[in-house]
């Protein structure tokens, strides 16, 4: 019969501590790109939905990651990640 593996001791860094550090990094990045009142309302919505739980922390992390990814991908003005907008230059007359 299979048995669950034994506890191999403490993790290198506690998961909760790592999660809170990630949340702080995302929050500090988000305030550089989004209005504070908007982020506050988002936080209130998450808090009203999940309360003061780890599920709420995970939800706000997931939401901020998605928002920042989309923001950078669409083309943040001070990011090198976004889509570059290039003008098309015609080489010669059109063959329509």
Curated annotation (Swiss-Prot):
UniProt modification remark: Phosphorylated on several residues by host. These phosphorylations regulate VPR activity for the nuclear import of the HIV-1 pre-integration complex.
Gene Ontology process terms (BP): DNA-templated transcription; monoatomic ion transmembrane transport; protein homooligomerization; regulation of DNA-templated transcription; symbiont entry into host cell; symbiont-mediated activation of host apoptosis; symbiont-mediated arrest of host cell cycle during G2/M transition; viral penetration into host nucleus
Subcellular compartments: Virion; Host nucleus; Host extracellular space
Keywords associated with the record: Activator, AIDS, Apoptosis, Cell cycle, Host G2/M cell cycle arrest by virus, Host nucleus, Host-virus interaction, Ion channel, Ion transport, Modulation of host cell cycle by virus, Phosphoprotein, Transcription, Transcription regulation, Transport, Viral penetration into host nucleus, Virion, Virus entry into host cell
Signal peptide feature range: none
InterPro entries per the UniProt record, alphabetical: RetroV_VpR/X (IPR000012)
Residues where Phosphoserine is found: 79, 94, 96
Gene3D superfamilies linked to this entry: 6.10.210.10, VpR/VpX protein, C-terminal domain
GO CC terms of this entry: host cell; host cell nucleus; host extracellular space; virion component
Other remarks on this protein: HIV-1 lineages are divided in three main groups, M (for Major), O (for Outlier), and N (for New, or Non-M, Non-O). The vast majority of strains found worldwide belong to the group M. Group O seems to be endemic to and largely confined to Cameroon and neighboring countries in West Central Africa, where these viruses represent a small minority of HIV-1 strains. The group N is represented by a limited number of isolates from Cameroonian persons. The group M is further subdivided in 9 clades or subtypes (A to D, F to H, J and K).
Subunit structure: Homooligomer, may form homodimer. Interacts with p6-gag region of the Pr55 Gag precursor protein through a (Leu-X-X)4 motif near the C-terminus of the P6gag protein. Interacts with host UNG. May interact with host RAD23A/HHR23A. Interacts with host VPRBP/DCAF1, leading to hijack the CUL4A-RBX1-DDB1-DCAF1/VPRBP complex, mediating ubiquitination of host proteins such as TERT and ZGPAT and arrest of the cell cycle in G2 phase.
Known role: During virus replication, may deplete host UNG protein, and incude G2-M cell cycle arrest. Acts by targeting specific host proteins for degradation by the 26S proteasome, through association with the cellular CUL4A-DDB1 E3 ligase complex by direct interaction with host VPRPB/DCAF-1. Cell cycle arrest reportedly occurs within hours of infection and is not blocked by antiviral agents, suggesting that it is initiated by the VPR carried into the virion. Additionally, VPR induces apoptosis in a cell cycle dependent manner suggesting that these two effects are mechanistically linked.
HAMAP family linked: HIV_VPR (MF_04080)
Assigned protein family: Belongs to the HIV-1 VPR protein family.
UniProt name for this protein: Protein Vpr
Organism for this UniProt entry: Human immunodeficiency virus type 1 group M subtype H (isolate VI991) (HIV-1)
């Amino acid at each position: 019969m299979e048995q669950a593996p034994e506890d191999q001791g403490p993790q290198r860094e506690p998961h909760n501590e790592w999660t809170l550090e990630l949340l702080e990094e995302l929050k500090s990045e988000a305030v550089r790109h989004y209005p504070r009142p908007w982020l506050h309302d988002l936080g209130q919505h998450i808090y009203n939905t999940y309360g003061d739980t780890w599920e709420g922390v995970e939800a706000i992390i997931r939401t901020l990651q998605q928002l920042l990814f989309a923001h950078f991908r669409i083309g943040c003005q001070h990011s090198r990640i976004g889509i570059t907008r290039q003008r098309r230059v015609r080489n010669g007359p059109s063959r329509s």
